């Protein structure tokens, strides 16, 4: 029997089912240990793989919210620990269900005291060797590649009205939580094995900057809104918390493990840090400049470039969300007075920065002033723009702004509606069921419940308006991404009209080749006019043989009217008296080496003009008409049996 798994965004009903599963498996383990039955290895592998760790703050915080759930988790872990000595005594590797990675993975579940006791048992029985540990971390390194191939790619390719969209949205959150929890588990196992004097490879941590960059690319700002909109109740805060949990976990693990790296691992870490990236910028903003610079002096320039990248991206996001509109010069007199009063106390802050801080704290001047003084409650993006010259711009408003208060209210209403529907379903089932003489159903009051006092009507209205606004803007983002933008579309930036350039070679080339039917009809006469060369074209100056590559170097002689033409001998004499230094090209000598007498047929094709006075080129229409006659004659001969 496998343990029921709970999701990162699990509901109370899921946790109740998980609690029952924990109690059932704990009872099974106790019975098998008492009766000395088999099947413990299968239970051990499934429980170790799915039991939540403390590193998974999403699942473990949900379990810790209720005493019974926490007790079920603790009892199952204790019974699981009791199975290890029995499995080792009976021959761990002799079992057909043996998985050595499960035994190593167990150390991420246990406390140090229990983990040390079990590790000594494994060393006595030689159940874990250094080769097993190396294989475990090699598989863990590959886990990153598999992990990032799920979630975001499937969600982006899913049709909006598809029933699988909510499933893929849940998968995106699961991937983010799994990345953060897996990195923390790997750090815990590495530290524990090093304390036990076992050699452990840390090569897996050199990929942390790459993973950090991929997460920020896949799960960007609009993607988070889209995922939250596809989930029940619009849990925007939890979706952003999952992304922050993943990024913060891998950053903390890297900062804690990087100083102790050596040799090959340290060299690869240095190469990753010398590249300008969001990871280097975030690590510098968290105050780890000295640690980064200890790997190489070149990282100092990488830190500056990374910070500049983050500043540009932050300003662009604020502009798209509309936060830069009328920045520093608000239309409201009260807001202007708030900015002036704060700048009297803190004159080193610009009016634009103070206005941006007021917008973040919902125009609460006291909270804004206290946050600017202490700097502890300021968000990272505001600290990033503290020394940047901000300018008011036209806010496009194409991205929805963050409003966790409204999203929390939407989620609360969705949960209340779900509870009401479940209660109504339960009552309907009780009514339809046959009434027995003795019923074990709880006695419900016949008195109708008193109507609730709605004291948050304004907050609910704001939340619903926010949800509608987010949905509208996400639909516009999808529409812009689905269809290529018109090349005539212009964007107003700093009072200038800029035409967006096509960044994709494929689509820009396709757009340049698009011709309407009206244009095709208009250019068809011109195309047909120059399609064939005919004797009546009047093109006497055109060379008469297009297949001849001989160059005629003779000069054109312009004769006067009513004057006899020179003879051919005179022309030859005039040609021989060419100025020195200009050599005449040799006459054409046949084609490709020639085959006997057939070389004469391939000689100089420039002949005398025809007797009928026609001096133009070949009749292209006749050639096109009869060009396949030779093939038809050959086919007739083959049919008659000549060949």
UniProtKB/Swiss-Prot annotation:
One Gene Ontology biological process: regulation of DNA-templated transcription
GO molecular function ontology, one term from the record: ubiquitin binding
Ranges of compositional bias, category Basic and acidic residues: 617-635
InterPro entries (alphabetical): ASCC2 (IPR052586), ASCC2_CUE (IPR041800), UBA-like_sf (IPR009060)
Biased composition, class Gly residues, residue ranges: 591-606
CDD domains: CUE_ASCC2 (cd14364)
Organism superkingdom: Eukaryota
Protein name: Uncharacterized protein C06E1.9
Organism lineage: Eukaryota, Metazoa, Ecdysozoa, Nematoda, Chromadorea
């Amino acid at each position: 029997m496998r343990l029921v798994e709970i999701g990162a965004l699990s509901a109370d009903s899921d946790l109740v089912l998980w609690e029952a599963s924990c109690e059932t498996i704990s009872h099974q383990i106790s019975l098998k240990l008492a009766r000395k039955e088999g099947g413990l290895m299968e239970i051990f592998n499934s429980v170790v793989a799915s039991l939540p760790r403390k590193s998974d703050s999403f699942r473990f915080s949900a379990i810790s919210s209720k005493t019974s759930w926490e007790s079920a988790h603790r009892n199952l872990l204790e019974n699981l620990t009791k199975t290890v000595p029995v499995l080792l005594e009976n021959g761990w590797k002799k079992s057909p269900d043996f998985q050595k990675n499960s035994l190593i993975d167990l150390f991420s579940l246990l406390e140090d005291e229990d983990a040390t006791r079990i590790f000594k048992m494994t060393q006595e029985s030689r159940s874990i060797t250094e080769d097993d540990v190396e294989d475990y971390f090699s598989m863990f390194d590959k886990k990153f590649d598999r992990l990032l191939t799920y979630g975001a790619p499937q969600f982006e390719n899913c049709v909006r009205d598809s029933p699988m969209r909510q499933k893929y949205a849940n998968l995106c959150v699961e991937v983010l939580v799994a990345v953060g929890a897996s990195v923390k588990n790997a750090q815990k196992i590495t530290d524990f094995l090093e304390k036990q004097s076992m050699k452990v490879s840390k090569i897996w941590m050199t990929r942390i900057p790459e993973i950090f960059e991929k997460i920020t690319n896949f799960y960007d700002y609009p993607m988070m809104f889209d995922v939250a909109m596809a989930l029940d109740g619009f849990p925007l805060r939890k979706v952003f918390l999952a992304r922050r949990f993943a990024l913060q976990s891998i950053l903390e693990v890297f900062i804690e493990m990087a100083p102790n790296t050596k040799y090959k691992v340290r060299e690869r870490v240095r190469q990753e840090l010398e590249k300008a990236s969001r990871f280097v910028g975030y690590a510098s903003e968290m105050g780890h400049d000295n640690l980064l610079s200890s790997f190489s002096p070149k990282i100092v320039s990488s830190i500056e470039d990374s910070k500049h990248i983050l500043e540009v991206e932050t300003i662009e996001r604020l502009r798209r969300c509309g936060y830069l509109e009328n920045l520093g010069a608000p239309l409201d007199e009260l807001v202007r007075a708030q900015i002036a009063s704060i700048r009297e106390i803190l004159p080193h802050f610009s009016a634009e920065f103070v206005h941006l801080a007021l917008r973040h704290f919902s125009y609460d001047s006291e909270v804004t002033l206290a946050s600017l003084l202490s700097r502890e409650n300021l968000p990272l993006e505001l600290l990033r723009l503290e020394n940047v010259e901000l300018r008011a711009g036209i806010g496009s408003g194409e991205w929805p702004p963050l409003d966790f208060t409204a999203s929390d209210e939407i989620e609360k209403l969705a949960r209340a509606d779900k509870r009401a529907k479940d209660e109504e379903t339960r009552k309907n089932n009780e009514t339809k069921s046959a009434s027995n003489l003795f019923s074990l159903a709880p006695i419900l009051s016949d008195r109708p419940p008193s109507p609730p006092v709605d004291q948050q009507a304004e907050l609910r209205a704001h939340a619903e308006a926010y949800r509608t606004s987010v949905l509208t803007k996400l639909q516009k983002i999808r529409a812009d991404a689905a269809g290529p933008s018109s090349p005539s579309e212009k964007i107003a930036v700093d009072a200038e009209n800029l035409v967006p350039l096509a960044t994709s070679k494929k689509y820009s080339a396709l757009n340049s080749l698009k011709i309407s039917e009206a244009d095709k009809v208009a250019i068809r006469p011109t195309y047909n006019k120059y399609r064939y060369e005919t004797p009546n074209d009047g093109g006497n100056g055109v060379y008469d043989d297009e297949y001849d590559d001989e160059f005629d170097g003779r000069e054109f002689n312009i004769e006067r009217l009513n004057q006899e033409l020179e003879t051919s001998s005179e022309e030859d004499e005039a040609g021989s008296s060419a100025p020195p230094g200009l050599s005449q090209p040799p006459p054409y000598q046949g084609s490709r080496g020639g085959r006997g007498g057939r070389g004469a047929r391939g000689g100089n094709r420039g002949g005398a003009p025809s007797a009928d006075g026609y001096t133009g080129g070949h009749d292209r229409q006749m050639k096109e008409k009869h060009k396949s006659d030779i093939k038809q004659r050959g086919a007739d001969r083959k049919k008659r049996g000549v060949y």
